[in-house]
Amino acid sequence: RLVEAGAQAIKILLYYNPFDEEQINSVKQAYVERIGAECLGMDVPFFLEPLVYDDAIGNEKGLAFARKKPEYVARAMEEFSKPRYGVDVLKVELPVNPAFVAGTRAFTGEGTAYSRQEAIEHFHNTASATSGPFIYLSAGSTDEVFCEMLELAAEARVKYSGALCGRATWQDAIPVYAREGVTALEGWLADRGLQNVQALNNVLARGATAWWDVYGGKDNIEVIEPNSALRT
């Protein structure tokens, strides 16, 4: 139905604890597998966004979970990179919580989960968990924090294929709109908002790689004409 309505890709968000009970995760895995099969049948790309959590630890933004997060992200990436799921691109969280990375501008001083070098290693190790293309999501970080974390990914020589962020680039415009209205909002977006996007683009230009590089370059990509019969 989505394809009939004009969708050119499908994106699914999945809350996932890789260490949860098997009966819970087997249902989630079957759900993703079914969507992957349908996307393959309809010849549309499948983007999966797994967000990790653990109810036993609690607060996903807290220090305790921050210390466990790299392993959880790596396990989720490893699982959903398996061919049976048919995921074309993983949209993944940063493997670290920026607030707890000592030695960075993002560090809040409210506890340390990792040093800067350890964070770089976590970027490298989690990226090694998948053999397919993936992009990072900002998860509501500020544009400055998100760009700094992408710079760490570049230091780790991570072959990520870009980023997807929304409010990281425009969230500071909300109070401007509340105080001064639509005209001020549009002015902010045309000025600071544009600067935020350009700054992100500059970071991506230095660190991100094309998705086809994962497969050895564009020349190794076999282009197959879509089967129009599948869309009727």
Positions of the model-derived regions?
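Charge-patterned, long linear interaction tracts outside catalytic cores
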Residues: 218-232
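Conserved, mostly hydrophobic/aromatic
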Residues: 49, 90, 166
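Long, hydrophobic, amphipathic alpha-helical segments used as structural scaffolds
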Residues: 43-50, 208-211
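Catalytic-face loop-and-helix region of soluble metabolic enzyme cores
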Residues: 93-215, 219
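Alpha-helix boundary/capping detector
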Residues: 29, 179-180, 226-230
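Alpha/beta enzyme core
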Residues: 1-10, 16-45, 53-132, 149-156
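Short hydrophobic alpha-helical runs that function as membrane-insertion/retention elements
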Residues: 11, 46-48, 135, 162
